[in-house]
Amino acid sequence: MKDVMGLIFTGENDIHLGELTSLRAVAALPIAGRYRVIDFQLSSMVHSGIKNVGVITQKNYSSLMDHIGSGREWDLHGKQGLVMLPPFLTRENMGVYSGLLDALKSNCTYLRLSRQEYIVLTNSHTIYNMDYTDALKYHIEKGADVTVLYAHGAKAVGTEGENDTFLSVDEDGKVTGMEIGS
């Protein structure tokens, strides 16, 4: 998948994790003593053939940077293989992204300079393994602007619905509506 770059957003709301995320990002939380939450997204991207991955950080990302290092564990240590994208202090940005859209806007230069035509954008707080190859093929075949991967009827445990996003889709799978935080 030469024409695809990966982008992992690590600025999720961590309010339910309290002390666990007081000094580290959700993406840097340990899993089974050896892995971190972000390992699943990085591995899924690399196993899908994605060779250029940007990690958008928000706060408490020191341990995340220590864990990821140069990206060698995922064979992303070459030129443009793995890029950390912290919130830089600028006129428009006070050093913290206000959300995903602000993070994307702040990193437009990085996105424009990439050689890839497509972007796989994911968060870092969901643990799963996935091969994105079929999803990208589907996206290209449909000529879609955006393709959303979702689980039908899934609900995150312990979220009490405050940040859930519900999609309405037609019989062809096209999104016809969206409700956030109901």
Segments (PLM) and residue ranges:
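Unchanged
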Residues: 1-182
